[in-house]
């Protein structure tokens, strides 16, 4: 009986140490961000934002779960094939995607659970510190020329027809 109790205590100790290792926080994160945003609204239906980061931690934590918050909306962050590479993406209607800087706040599992708890309790989520933040500069989307090429071609055609008809009338007169 005593052997079973000590074996159970050993298993509990092993499980608790494993859970502490897997949920280890990233200390002093160093990031290398890159991002892409849609610039042409003529050929797309929504503005897409893609943020890729390369993350290294001072304590060498790898493959941690990350979550992103953009303007109060949360998105899961996917891990890349390479160690320490992560990506998050989202899309907005062209009218909603204003030109300017978007702050993408990244959270680990612990701070993300605090964020979700604050949301459930209708508390201010801006007081929860992110693991790190990436600023995405979106310059807006180009909606094409003010006058479509078809209308411009038709107008030029009408002007040429008028000039040709006028010249013909002057020659025949």
Swiss-Prot record:
Pfam families: TRAP-delta
Cytoplasmic side: 166-173
Location(s) in or outside the cell: Endoplasmic reticulum membrane
Region forming the signal peptide: 1-23
Disulfide bond positions: 26-57
Transmembrane segments annotated in the record for this chain: 145-165
UniProt main location, coarse: endoplasmic reticulum
Membrane topology according to the record: Single-pass type I membrane protein
Subunit structure, interactors included: Heterotetramer of TRAP-alpha, TRAP-beta, TRAP-delta and TRAP-gamma.
Family that this chain belongs to: Belongs to the TRAP-delta family.
Function (record text): TRAP proteins are part of a complex whose function is to bind calcium to the ER membrane and thereby regulate the retention of ER resident proteins.
Pathological association: Congenital disorder of glycosylation 1Y: A form of congenital disorder of glycosylation, a multisystem disorder caused by a defect in glycoprotein biosynthesis and characterized by under-glycosylated serum glycoproteins. Congenital disorders of glycosylation result in a wide variety of clinical features, such as defects in the nervous system development, psychomotor retardation, dysmorphic features, hypotonia, coagulation disorders, and immunodeficiency.
Name this protein carries in UniProt: Translocon-associated protein subunit delta
Species name: Homo sapiens (Human)
Gene: SSR4
């Amino acid at each position: 009986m005593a052997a079973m109790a000590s074996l159970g205590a050993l298993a509990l100790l092993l499980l608790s140490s494993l859970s502490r290792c897997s949920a280890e926080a990233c200390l002093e994160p160093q990031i290398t961000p890159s991002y892409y945003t849609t610039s042409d609204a003529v050929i797309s239906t929504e503005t897409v934002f893609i943020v890729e980061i390369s993350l290294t931690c001072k304590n060498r934590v790898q493959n941690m779960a990350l979550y992103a918050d953009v303007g109060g909306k949360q998105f899961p962050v996917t891990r890349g094939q390479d160690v320490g590479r992560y990506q998050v993406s989202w899309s907005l209607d062209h009218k909603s995607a204003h030109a300017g800087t978007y702050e993408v706040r990244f959270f680990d599992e612990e701070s993300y659970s605090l964020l979700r708890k604050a949301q459930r309790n209708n508390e201010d989520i801006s007081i929860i510190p992110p693991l790190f933040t990436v600023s995405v500069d979106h310059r807006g989307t180009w909606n094409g020329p003010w006058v479509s090429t078809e209308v411009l071609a038709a107008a030029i055609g009408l002007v040429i027809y008028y000039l040709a008809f006028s010249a013909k009338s002057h020659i025949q007169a």
